[in-house]
Amino acid sequence: MGNTTSCCVSSSPKLRRNAHSRLESYRPDTDLSREDTGCNLQHISDRENIDDLNMEFNPSDHPRASTIFLSKSQTDVREKRKSLFINHHPPGQTSRKYSSCSTIFLDDSTVSQPNLKYTIKCVALAIYYHIKNRDPDGRMLLDIFDENLHPLSKSEVPPDYDKHNPEQKQIYRFVRTLFSAAQLTAECAIVTLVYLERLLTYAEIDICPANWKRIVLGAILLASKVWDDQAVWNVDYCQILKDITVEDMNELERQFLELLQFNINVPSSVYAKYYFDLRSLAEANNLSFPLEPLSRERAHKLEAISRLCEDKYKDLRKPMRKRSASADNLILPRWSPAIIS
């Protein structure tokens, strides 16, 4: 017991179609000494930087990479615009409010405090485009996300559960139910979408009718624990989804983290990119955020906030200032000629 080393290796996520090559099981070498195996363990920070080259093209890690959901929605957006042009729909059917000299319309959604209802609608729309415009050839399907193997309710799963794409309203109701019961914030919804796209990229899988509920559930579960100050426990989700067990939730969370390679970091630049891309998605699909006329109270509040930011900016610039002389009253020293005799 004192001179032997034991290692517990967790089982990798089971695959249904292709072998998962990103996660390699640990194989101890009997020829290595204890010094070679114990002192040269890889640090977790080194493991996170393995795919630095691929990270530049991963939208959930790099702020300059385009989000996947926005690119998947472009085809449908172009078709909608084309149909509107062909059918000669008048622009008056879409009621939009525009600011004028007398009235200014603003929405209450900002990057730091997004509107909860419309953020969930945008996230549900992004998930809808992920499912609708997925790879037609079909990629591998992990058992842990298969709703037939791990049902969320005791009701019988229909035999064609993996054939029909869910509607946007169905996805919205599912996400809204979880957010309302767990009292999650709008920021958590954006982080949920970041984790979802990171999972699809890292694990090289597609979200489809057979697995979308459990993938979304795992992303919400992880985002609520990472982002919110008052994290929701797994047993709380079991009270929301009455027929799911705590063991199933624990296994879902464990394998989700494993497939993310334990990379739960969301930089502020990536978060801001997803927020503004969601706004672009909403505008392209006529899902506008609620606009309200600018009131006097809100104008004073915005003025106070801007003045506070301006004062902070001035305080930061003060140590950097250098005194300089004006050229108007510039007096140069005059040298009197010296007589050398």
Curated annotation (Swiss-Prot):
<feature type="modified residue" description="Phosphoserine; by CDK14">
    <location>
        <position position="71"/>
    </location>
</feature>
<dbReference type="GO" id="GO:0016055">
    <property type="term" value="P:Wnt signaling pathway"/>
</dbReference>
<dbReference type="GO" id="GO:0060828">
    <property type="term" value="P:regulation of canonical Wnt signaling pathway"/>
</dbReference>
<feature type="modified residue" description="Phosphothreonine">
    <location>
        <position position="75"/>
    </location>
</feature>
<comment type="similarity">
    <text>Belongs to the cyclin family. Cyclin Y subfamily.</text>
</comment>
<keyword id="KW-0449">Lipoprotein</keyword>
<keyword id="KW-0879">Wnt signaling pathway</keyword>
<comment type="function">
    <text>Positive regulatory subunit of the cyclin-dependent kinase CDK14/PFTK1. Acts as a cell-cycle regulator of Wnt signaling pathway during G2/M phase by recruiting CDK14/PFTK1 to the plasma membrane and promoting phosphorylation of LRP6, leading to the activation of the Wnt signaling pathway. Recruits CDK16 to the plasma membrane. Positive regulatory subunit of the cyclin-dependent kinase CDK16.</text>
</comment>
<dbReference type="GO" id="GO:0005730">
    <property type="term" value="C:nucleolus"/>
</dbReference>
<keyword id="KW-0597">Phosphoprotein</keyword>
<dbReference type="InterPro" id="IPR006671">
    <property type="entry name" value="Cyclin_N"/>
</dbReference>
<keyword id="KW-1003">Cell membrane</keyword>
<feature type="modified residue" description="Phosphoserine; by CDK14">
    <location>
        <position position="295"/>
    </location>
</feature>
<keyword id="KW-0519">Myristate</keyword>
<feature type="modified residue" description="Phosphoserine; by CDK14">
    <location>
        <position position="288"/>
    </location>
</feature>
<feature type="modified residue" description="Phosphoserine">
    <location>
        <position position="100"/>
    </location>
</feature>
<dbReference type="InterPro" id="IPR036915">
    <property type="entry name" value="Cyclin-like_sf"/>
</dbReference>
<dbReference type="InterPro" id="IPR013763">
    <property type="entry name" value="Cyclin-like_dom"/>
</dbReference>
<feature type="modified residue" description="Phosphoserine; by CDK14">
    <location>
        <position position="73"/>
    </location>
</feature>
<feature type="modified residue" description="Phosphoserine">
    <location>
        <position position="326"/>
    </location>
</feature>
<feature type="modified residue" description="Phosphoserine">
    <location>
        <position position="33"/>
    </location>
</feature>
<feature type="modified residue" description="Phosphothreonine">
    <location>
        <position position="30"/>
    </location>
</feature>
<feature type="modified residue" description="Phosphoserine">
    <location>
        <position position="25"/>
    </location>
</feature>
<feature type="lipid moiety-binding region" description="N-myristoyl glycine">
    <location>
        <position position="2"/>
    </location>
</feature>
<dbReference type="GO" id="GO:0010508">
    <property type="term" value="P:positive regulation of autophagy"/>
</dbReference>
<dbReference type="GO" id="GO:0051301">
    <property type="term" value="P:cell division"/>
</dbReference>
<dbReference type="GO" id="GO:0005654">
    <property type="term" value="C:nucleoplasm"/>
</dbReference>
<feature type="modified residue" description="Phosphothreonine; by CDK14">
    <location>
        <position position="67"/>
    </location>
</feature>
<feature type="modified residue" description="Phosphothreonine">
    <location>
        <position position="37"/>
    </location>
</feature>
<keyword id="KW-0131">Cell cycle</keyword>
<keyword id="KW-0195">Cyclin</keyword>
<dbReference type="InterPro" id="IPR012399">
    <property type="entry name" value="Cyclin_Y"/>
</dbReference>
<keyword id="KW-0132">Cell division</keyword>
<feature type="modified residue" description="Phosphoserine; by CDK14">
    <location>
        <position position="83"/>
    </location>
</feature>
<keyword id="KW-0472">Membrane</keyword>
<dbReference type="GO" id="GO:0005886">
    <property type="term" value="C:plasma membrane"/>
</dbReference>
<feature type="modified residue" description="Phosphoserine">
    <location>
        <position position="21"/>
    </location>
</feature>
<comment type="subunit">
    <text>Found in a complex with CAPRIN2, LRP6 and CDK14 during G2/M stage; CAPRIN2 functions as a scaffold for the complex by binding to CCNY via its N terminus and to CDK14 via its C terminus. Interacts with CDK14. Interacts with CDK16. Interacts with LRP6.</text>
</comment>
<dbReference type="Pfam" id="PF00134">
    <property type="entry name" value="Cyclin_N"/>
</dbReference>
<protein>
    <recommendedName>
        <fullName>Cyclin-Y</fullName>
    </recommendedName>
</protein>
<feature type="modified residue" description="Phosphoserine">
    <location>
        <position position="102"/>
    </location>
</feature>
<dbReference type="GO" id="GO:0000086">
    <property type="term" value="P:G2/M transition of mitotic cell cycle"/>
</dbReference>
